[in-house]
Amino acid sequence: MSASSSGGSPRFPSCGKNGVTSLTQKKVLRAPCGAPSVTVTKSHKRGMKGDTVNVRRSVRVKTKVPWMPPGKSSARPVGCKWENPPHCLEITPPSSEKLVSVMRLSDLSTEDDDSGHCKMNRYDKKIDSLMNAVGCLKSEVKMQKGERQMAKRFLEERKEELEEVAHELAETEHENTVLRHNIERMKEEKDFTILQKKHLQQEKECLMSKLVEAEMDGAAAAKQVMALKDTIGKLKTEKQMTCTDINTLTRQKELLLQKLSTFEETNRTLRDLLREQHCKEDSERLMEQQGALLKRLAEADSEKARLLLLLQDKDKEVEELLQEIQCEKAQAKTASELSKSMESMRGHLQAQLRSKEAENSRLCMQIKNLERSGNQHKAEVEAIMEQLKELKQKGDRDKESLKKAIRAQKERAEKSEEYAEQLHVQLADKDLYVAEALSTLESWRSRYNQVVKEKGDLELEIIVLNDRVTDLVNQQQTLEEKMREDRDSLVERLHRQTAEYSAFKLENERLKASFAPMEDKLNQAHLEVQQLKASVKNYEGMIDNYKSQVMKTRLEADEVAAQLERCDKENKILKDEMNKEIEAARRQFQSQLADLQQLPDILKITEAKLAECQDQLQGYERKNIDLTAIISDLRSRIEHQGDKLEMAREKHQASQKENKQLSLKVDELERKLEATSAQNIEFLQVIAKREEAIHQSQLRLEEKTRECGTLARQLESAIEDARRQVEQTKEHALSKERAAQNKILDLETQLSRTKTELSQLRRSRDDADRRYQSRLQDLKDRLEQSESTNRSMQNYVQFLKSSYANVFGDGPYSTFLTSSPIRSRSPPA
């Protein structure tokens, strides 16, 4: 009865102070009926990133017996018989082969560990693939950074080229403006020269008309002189002056005087015209100088304003280029920050994924351990139930044997009945313990279900996070593709602009090449104009000479007129004298008709006087001939000047034609300049469109950065939620583990109480059953055998401890093994 009762009370060793256990492996040693059963459970967990090792070991021994070294048996005989006629109680100890055969190395199989290792290998492969993907992404990011740097360098080179192009365009615009001003000056000078030529032509026509009038007057005076000459010649031939001759002389004299007066008037008008011409020329020169100075001042002001505008435009362009460079730098910084944040987010997410996978693996291992512990609890409950059944059967047998053997000892029977009642109470306690174990099993099942649910939630969160990561990666790829497209479009635009700039360069070179002969022609035209001006000046000098000659001729004509007046006066005097002489001669002829001898003297005197008059007439004729020669020289000179004027007109017409050709070329150049200005406007429009596209791309980048920021915030919030959930699950698991530890402690207290009760029962049994020492000796032998098995198990456990200590090293597991209650147990004295 005592053996059965001692076999029916299993022992639960107290756990260590660290208390957190996880069951992974199980070893149950069963003996036949009456043999002690030892259940050894042990676990280990291979954690990731500093996870602790949790081990629970429980050795259940029925009774406490003296220590016996392993491999030795008791000194007493194997079989002990207690004979009492007419009954015989035979006790056979269990064979060591059965005990040893129960414990096998196959029970220490690591199939679950292999499956866990497979999962861990899979996770490692996944992590390696993720790390490879991260490495690829990093390399891509580096390549993108290199491409961005190359693009930046290319853009800077293109900017420098654009600045050079802008500088050259400014130079070409300046040259074009200078050409325009020169062409305008040429046009103005041309118009001014045309007006001058028209005015000179009008003045020339006026002078020519006045000269023609003067020539006509001179010719009329010459005719009158010739008429006087003829009349004087007639008078010579006739030698007698009639009234008609006198009248003709007087008439010719009057006509000559009229012609001379008209000649004087024409000379005066010519002098007035020449004076007016000189005054006009002086005033025109002054006006031209004043207009040229005003034009120069206006041109200087316009050049100053244009240069100021160009400086302002260049400053604006420089500011715009600086703003573009700053925007591109900000974009590069934002892109680098985005790439860095994406890399950090990737690393953070990968670390979180690894931690989640490690936690999932740990939770799976914990779930498996819980399942194993549940199965162990079930097996333990079944073993306890079987032991209870065996104990009941054994108790019934013992009762029957004791009733048959000890009928006389009623007191012992009553005591045994009381003991049986106590055993029934213990059985009830065991039933309660089984119920509690079942409740704990149900709680573990609920916990397992909750853990499975949490695992599913975590997997869903991981899937969502992976989707977000893929979305972010896709968004980054789309952004990079857009940036590449924008960069390609900018490069294409730059190529187009360079091609257009080269075309502009060629056109400018062609225009310059065409401008050189135009400049030569313009210089030739200027030289011709200067030659014309010099010829005009020469003509003016000639006109001055002619004026001086005309003045001389006027003076000579005045002298001739004075001489003619003198001659007229002398003629009048002579006529009067002749009349007087004729009258005197008549009177003398009448008075001295008789004096015929005096007539030849008078004739000689008259002949001498006539000879003198003829000499005077010849002198006058000579003077008239000289005057006619002078007039013919003047006519020849005027004709020569007319030829020169015609040559000048022809040259002027040729210069006008050349000026027309030059104006046509200038118009073509102006058209080309207008085309270039239109192309410049188109370039400005293209640049404005490019700036608008850049601004739109900047806005898109800002939107994408905002979206990335919102996504990063969402990721951070999701990660924080996952962390909170994981912490909550950890806290929940810790609380459950603490509750389990508390329950284990309660069970240990109950076991200690049962142990104390058993010790009291043993004392009472020893005090009451001293007579049954033989049976007690048998029981002691059996207990020694069980103790030997326990010691062998302890040695095996010690071997396992040393092996696990060698495997796991120093740590909480070794401290737990050293603090195990099995080692501290000492054999009874």
From Swiss-Prot:
Region (Interaction with BBOF1) location: 537-701
Modification note: Tyrosine phosphorylated. Phosphorylated by TSSK4 on Ser-95.
Function of the protein: Seems to be a major component of sperm tail outer dense fibers (ODF). ODFs are filamentous structures located on the outside of the axoneme in the midpiece and principal piece of the mammalian sperm tail and may help to maintain the passive elastic structures and elastic recoil of the sperm tail. May have a modulating influence on sperm motility. Functions as a general scaffold protein that is specifically localized at the distal/subdistal appendages of mother centrioles. Component of the centrosome matrix required for the localization of PLK1 and NIN to the centrosomes.
Tagged with keyword Coiled coil: yes
Cross-link Glycyl lysine isopeptide (Lys-Gly) (interchain with G-Cter in SUMO2), sequence positions: K138
InterPro entries per the UniProt record, alphabetical: Odf2-rel
Primary location recorded for the protein, binned into one broad class: cytoplasm
The keyword Transferase appears for this protein: no
A molecular-function term among this protein's GO annotations: small GTPase binding
Record region (Disordered): 392-413
Coiled-coil segments: 144-217, 245-423, 461-798
A Gene Ontology cellular-component term: centriolar subdistal appendage
Compartments reported by the entry: Cytoplasm, Cytoskeleton, Microtubule organizing center, Centrosome; Cell projection, Cilium; Cytoplasm, Cytoskeleton, Microtubule organizing center, Centrosome, Centriole; Cytoplasm, Cytoskeleton, Spindle pole
Phosphoserine modified-residue sites: S73, S74, S95, S106, S109, S115, S129, S139, S261, S632
Keywords: Cell projection, Cilium, Coiled coil, Cytoplasm, Cytoskeleton, Developmental protein, Differentiation, Flagellum, Isopeptide bond, Microtubule, Phosphoprotein, Spermatogenesis, Ubl conjugation
Tissue distribution of the protein: Testis-specific (at protein level). Highly expressed in cytoplasm of step 2 round spermatids. Detected in the middle piece and extends to about half the principal piece of the sperm tails.
Record note on quaternary structure: Self-associates. Associates with microtubules and forms a fibrillar structure partially linked to the microtubule network. Interacts via its C-terminus with PLK1. Interacts with ODF1. Interacts with MARK4; the interaction is required for localization of ODF2 to centrioles. Interacts with TSSK4. Interacts with AKNA. Interacts with QRICH2. Interacts with CFAP58. Interacts with BBOF1. Interacts with CCDC38. Interacts with CCDC42.
Residue(s) carrying Phosphothreonine: T92, T110, T231
Protein's recorded name: Outer dense fiber protein 2
Gene name for this UniProt entry: ODF2
Biological process according to GO: cell differentiation; centriole-centriole cohesion; cilium organization; protein localization; regulation of cilium assembly; spermatogenesis
